[in-house]
């Protein structure tokens, strides 16, 4: 029998009590700098490992109750200013008809990756996200109710190039050479696949907003293997298309606009372009200097990031000092503190707490000046 929670409707949500994250995303006044972490619902938490023990990863992703619980776990420990729904970027290729398995110690694996352009015929041409990915929407709606207005809930997706790379490589890759071979050898087929992915992603993000997501993040995790020319041809146009189309559809649906974040990891060369792409927030990794990022984006967007996650292996004192420098570099306006990548499984939860505390404390000092 289905849990009654599965039938909870995306309306009458509890009132939001802490909207600091949403205000910072829009560049509005704040009392403290908001902070959250990519992969804050993750294996570094003993309770997360306990909840996940012995369960198939994607089976967990398909359980709204499990996703809700995992999303809420970090909020019980730390005063984060936002939650991000527990899910995975690879649910999109699954919805398009590809099989993905999570192999312990190896990560996500596609038993039958796309090898040549004719393999595109294996993908569904029409994807009904509301039937294929309804479990994500249900998880978002359930979590919005269970979070009781404590903080906003972020929905997310992988970006087209990042998903294309997984679908061709068959998993993670150091060089992405199989996927990049397509860009150089089969540019037309590459654009066809990227367009197909974009269409599904737009509907998927709209569905997340309808379900209750209060912000959206688009993860372009594999920007670093592209040069500036390839980025401008195979990544940027699709990132822009997603933001514009999602915003148009939100408007058409009579829903309130939600802030959108684009995170193109290692895409320094694209910073100016990304700041003119209809996203309210640009996420940064730790290889960019905060002050130069401010200059290069010219106040057009809010910024999110960008502490090296490995700084969390240091002492609480060093974490506090690194956070102070980071905040002084970014300034307090239009800024969301985060890491420049996700939390790693072997990190000490105590140090994650120290990071959050340092952001809140230092930002209150800065705002008094």
UniProtKB/Swiss-Prot annotation:
GO biological process: heme biosynthetic process; porphyrin-containing compound catabolic process; porphyrin-containing compound metabolic process; protoporphyrinogen IX biosynthetic process
Annotated GO CC locations: cytosol
UniProt: coproporphyrinogen III binding residues: 39, 41, 43, 88, 166, 221, 341
Catalytic activity: uroporphyrinogen III + 4 H(+) = coproporphyrinogen III + 4 CO2; uroporphyrinogen I + 4 H(+) = coproporphyrinogen I + 4 CO2
Pathway: Porphyrin-containing compound metabolism; protoporphyrin-IX biosynthesis; coproporphyrinogen-III from 5-aminolevulinate: step 4/4
EC number: 4.1.1.37
Site feature (Transition state stabilizer) residues: 88
Source superkingdom: Eukaryota
Subcellular location(s) of the protein: Cytoplasm, Cytosol
Residues binding coproporphyrinogen I: 39, 41, 43, 52, 88, 166, 221, 341
UniProt keyword terms in alphabetical order: Cytoplasm, Decarboxylase, Heme biosynthesis, Lyase, Porphyrin biosynthesis
Enzyme class: lyase
Subcellular location, principal: cytoplasm
A Pfam family annotated for this UniProt entry: URO-D
GO MF term set: uroporphyrinogen decarboxylase activity
Family: Belongs to the uroporphyrinogen decarboxylase family.
Functional summary from the UniProt entry: Catalyzes the sequential decarboxylation of the four acetate side chains of uroporphyrinogen to form coproporphyrinogen and participates in the fifth step in the heme biosynthetic pathway. Isomer I or isomer III of uroporphyrinogen may serve as substrate, but only coproporphyrinogen III can ultimately be converted to heme. In vitro also decarboxylates pentacarboxylate porphyrinogen I.
Quaternary structure and interacting proteins, as annotated: Homodimer.
HAMAP family: URO_D
Name of the protein: Uroporphyrinogen decarboxylase
């Amino acid at each position: 029998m289905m849990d009654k929670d599965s039938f909870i409707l995306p309306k009458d949500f509890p009132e939001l009590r802490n909207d600091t994250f949403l205000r910072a995303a829009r560049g509005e006044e704040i009392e403290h700098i908001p902070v959250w972490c990519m992969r804050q619902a993750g294996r570094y938490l003993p309770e997360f490992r306990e909840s996940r023990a012995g369960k198939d990863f994607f089976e967990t992703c398909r359980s709204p109750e499990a996703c809700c619980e995992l999303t809420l776990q970090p909020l019980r420990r730390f005063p984060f200013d936002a939650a991000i729904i527990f899910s995975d970027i690879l649910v999109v290729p699954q919805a398009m008809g590809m099989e993905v398995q999570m192999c312990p110690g190896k990560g996500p694996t596609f038993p039958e990756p796309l090898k040549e352009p004719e393999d595109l015929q294996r993908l569904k041409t029409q994807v009904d996200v509301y039937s294929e990915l309804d479990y994500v929407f249900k998880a978002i709606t359930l979590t919005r109710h269970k979070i009781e207005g404590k903080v906003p809930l972020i929905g997310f997706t992988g970006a087209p190039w990042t998903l294309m790379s997984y679908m061709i490589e068959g998993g993670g890759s150091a060089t992405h050479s199989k996927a990049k071979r397509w860009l150089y050898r089969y540019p037309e087929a590459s654009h066809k696949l990227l367009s197909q992915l974009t269409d599904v992603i737009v509907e998927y993000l709209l569905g997340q907003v309808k379900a209750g997501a209060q912000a959206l993040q688009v993860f372009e995790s594999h920007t670093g293997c592209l040069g500036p020319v390839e980025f401008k041809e195979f990544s940027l146009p699709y990132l822009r298309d997603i933001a514009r189309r999602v915003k148009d559809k939100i408007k058409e649906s009579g829903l309130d606009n939600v802030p959108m974040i684009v995170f193109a990891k290692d895409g320094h060369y694209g910073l100016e372009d990304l700041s003119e792409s209809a996203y309210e927030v640009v996420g940064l990794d730790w290889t960019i200097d905060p002050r130069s990022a401010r200059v290069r984006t010219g106040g057009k967007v809010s910024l999110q990031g960008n502490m090296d996650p490995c700084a969390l292996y240091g002492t609480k004192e060093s974490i506090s000092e690194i956070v102070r420098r980071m905040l002084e570099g970014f300034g307090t306006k239009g800024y969301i503190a985060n890491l420049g990548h996700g939390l790693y499984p072997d990190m000490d939860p105590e140090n994650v707490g120290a990071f959050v505390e340092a952001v809140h404390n230092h930002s209150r000092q800065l705002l008094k000046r």
